Amino acid sequence: LEQSSRYADLTLDEAGSLRNGEHVLVAYIMKPKMGYDYLATAAHFAAESCTGARSTDDAKESANAVVYYIDADSQEMRIAYPTVLFDSNLTDGRDMVRSFLTLAIGNTQGMEDVEFGKIYDFYLPPSFLRLQESPSVNTMWRILDKGASNGGLAAGAMKPKLGMQPKPFRAASYALWQGGAYTTADVQANQAPTQASEGIPEVVKAMRSCVQGTDVAKRHSGGNYTDEPKEMDARGKYVLSQFGPFSGNCVSLVAGYAAGGSARHTFPRQFVHYHRAGQASTSSPQTQRGYSAFVHTKISQVISTTSIHADTMSFGKTQGDSPDKSIAVMLQDDAADARLCNQEWEGMRQNAPIISGSMNALRLPAFFETLGNSNVILTADSGSFGHKDGPASGAIACRQVEEAWKAWRSGQYGNVSLSDGVVEFAKTHEEIKGAFLTFPKDADEIYPGWKEKLGCTAEASVPPASFVNAKISTASSAAVATARTTMNAAKMASQSTAGSAVNPYTGGLKSIHPASSSNTARTVLLSRQGREAALQD
């Protein structure tokens, strides 16, 4: 059914639509199937996105979506959707993002005359945005006592996906936190190997002990992937009840649009860690249908989550491209500078970008330089636990390379390349040097000549470590002996007065403060007795 006269108007002025504020503008890459006219297919696409090509009438015309721009050669199509199309809540009158998704990203992308269609940007007018909610909790740096902005790297999320039992998980969390990392994540939730009723109390013990020892806030991201709102509510309340005074440091880890909105409403005071569940199936550069990663992230901003995975511009394992930088910048700025038009956020609070995907210390400096800052949450499970000297050294190395990047940027090493600056920094920082030996393939690609510069030509590279119970800490015997002799007995006694529920880790423990220089960041986490106590308690 030819509907271009009703659902297309190529004379429509985009600037005028922006001024009147009555349309949501959506930009697509769309290709008709062979033999179909581009404009006719675009009009059919618009019709099925709104009032319907076969059931419309003149009375519905004010609600018609209109194709206002096409370029058949570049396969670009833009549609203006009247804001009156979108559903709103009965309870408070707010517009529904779900309604926008249904119309703009619905089944139109797979119609009989459409080869593919993919959204690469959209614009929401102020009238639509003002009917959305801003997060009750802003960026996570306040939680970690790092200031409201420019908080720097919050590194080291550990997220075992299956099979780690409660006590090893507690010990691993403790080791990572003691290494200067701020975050652990529990995506196991209530799986058979680690029931929530057993696992969460163990993490609480680790956080309590670590915060007491370092006087530095830590964060735990509790898995709250559920099918039902009641289950989400029950899990969230249970976790918060267990953490008690540390409940403000708990994050609700959710996946999917509905879950993000539900978590925000149910737990308005908690930081919402929003995971783009299955995002690669739609937002990967290899996918011709769905929407780009930029669009997915923009939607998360609209539903007012407080953080979202922003990928790593191909510095990690996940496919990415230059728009990934735009994603991270958009989450932290008051406006999104995009391909379609500038999106003002109307005072919505900032989001915190999360980067993940097999990142390690060696890959971070170039990522920071490309992004222009280091204000991200890093999940570096393999980068921390894969380090040859264990998770603490892996976490310390991630913090150290941030310092190395800042030192290079400030001109401390003169007119040298970033890679040479990091190598120079590594000469006096054993954890980074250990990362070079642990990840030699990355080292060879990013830091040519590193072996000669670091004097490692005679040293064999070592395989990444695997996390096993016996390797929570790989502190040398000499370091352990030093820790034993320097430990203040009175402090140890005071730490142990509350019993194992407060401080289950005994033995040679030397704490550090993340604000200290990386020269003081090297630490002995657990003596041999401490490791055994951590595993057997």
From Swiss-Prot:
Molecular function in Gene Ontology: magnesium ion binding; ribulose-bisphosphate carboxylase activity
Disulfide-bonded cysteines: none
List, in alphabetical order, the GO biological process terms annotated in this UniProt record. Answer: carbon fixation
Gene3D superfamilies named among the record's database cross-references: Ribulose bisphosphate carboxylase, large subunit, C-terminal domain (3.20.20.110), RuBisCO large subunit, N-terminal domain (3.30.70.150)
Q: What role does this protein play?
A: Unknown. Probably does not have RuBisCO activity.
The miscellaneous remark of the record is:
Only found in Symbiodinium A, a minor symbiont of the giant clam Tridacna gigas.
Q: Which family does it belong to?
A: Belongs to the RuBisCO large chain family. Type IV subfamily.
Q: What is this protein called?
A: Uncharacterized ribulose bisphosphate carboxylase-like protein
